Amino acid sequence: MTIDETKKKKMLSYRWLVFIALAIAYFFVYFHRTTGGAISTTLMDYFGVGTASVALLASAYLYAYTLMQIPSGILTDRMGPRKAATIFVALIAVGSLLSAYSATANDFNLMIAGKFIIGIGAAVVYIPIMKVLAVWFRKNEFATMSGILLLVGNVGGIAAATPMVLMMDALGIEMTYIVLAIITALIALLVWLLVRNHPMEKDLPSIEEIVSEETGQPITESTSEKMGTVEALKRTFLSGRNFWPLAIWFFVMYGTIMLWQASQAGAYYKNIGGFDAGTAGMMLTMVGVGMVFGCPLAGKLSDSYLHSRKKVVIIGTVVYTLIWAFIYLTADSADILTNEMIQYVINFCFGFFGGFFVVSYAQIKELYPIAMAGTSTAALNLFPFAGGAILITIAGFLVTDQTLDQYKTVWLMALGLMVLGCICAFLSKEKEHDA
């Protein structure tokens, strides 16, 4: 079958509008995920609460996000990415409004409730985007596009630091969250207007039809196929090496990233390294900057050069593990720990190679039928956030007096877990790609 060239060009152009609308939404997913640390002092002063309450606020988002991972996959496969993303981006706006009202009522519990609602909404954004990438983009573009998406997300994470603090200083807590609610509501409208579940909804050829014409190969799988929820879950969780090595790997990989970036590193630099809060914050910003470069590069390496998901995952995991070894082994060295340049480089490399995790989404997607792309990706995505929640909780019990020995115990735990992560990366499976 010959494809109309005009429709083909329109499809290959329109998909970028779909991606841009969803990427803007994902910017704010990352923004809300990482904003707590930067404004923690402001919140403590305004509401009269302590560090434990602020930690609870951060974990409210995390636990909501984790709990919604499997439902997000089911909702995406059943409702379609367009409706699922629109509804739950709008829910982020609702959570932002509740956060604004918490400042008016001077009720920190309402702020926590607002953060929890934001977490629920944010959880059902990433999986619809993964489904859209699977339907609108070629298979050899998936990892690259995932990397670009994570780049956008990490820019959102960077914006959640100093820019958020400046905005809150200028507008106050209430008006800041009202502005965020309005922006998010407009983004939900943009998603509804631009996103389509499948090219056929705009009378355009599917990506598999385009690829078939380009390669001369017959279509073996349709992006319009659907599968029952129970069947998709069974095929995911009972698939042995297709799923579990990657799941365990992601648990420890992203769990240790969050352990460092979102929990212990700031206090470690302040209490052991002797840095002020501003300098420590700038050092940790380099983790996000590293990911801005590492995520898209990993995707490009996977799609265009190494033609392998697994090799890229292994490279990133091994180097990331070596960075943890460096952190642990040099913790006793005051000359290294107090050297700002070394710590900036370490945090950049930490984020750069840690960001190679993005390729795992392409790896898992290709091991299952396209009809269960949402469910299989959501099942995998359950583990990194569970890893972060659990490891941060464990670290909280281990670091009670904030002594060097206690931090070293946590770093050793992270290093040991990453050795396990390396083993799992080597044991993981991938679909073979043509060079």
Locate each region found by the language model.
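Juxtamembrane intracellular "pre-TM" segments in multi-pass secondary transporters
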Residues: 3-12, 198-247
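Extracytoplasmic
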Residues: 17-51, 67, 72, 260-266, ...
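Conserved MFS/SLC helix-loop-helix module at the cytosolic interface between two early adjacent transmembrane helices
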Residues: 67-108
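Cytoplasmic membrane-interface "Motif A"-like loop-to-helix N-cap segments
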Residues: 78-89, 303-318
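C-terminal ends and interior cores of transmembrane alpha-helices
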Residues: 90-105, 318-336
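Cytoplasmic helix-loop-helix junction between adjacent transmembrane helices
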Residues: 114-152
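Helix-loop-helix hairpin linking two adjacent transmembrane segments in secondary transporters
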Residues: 149-202
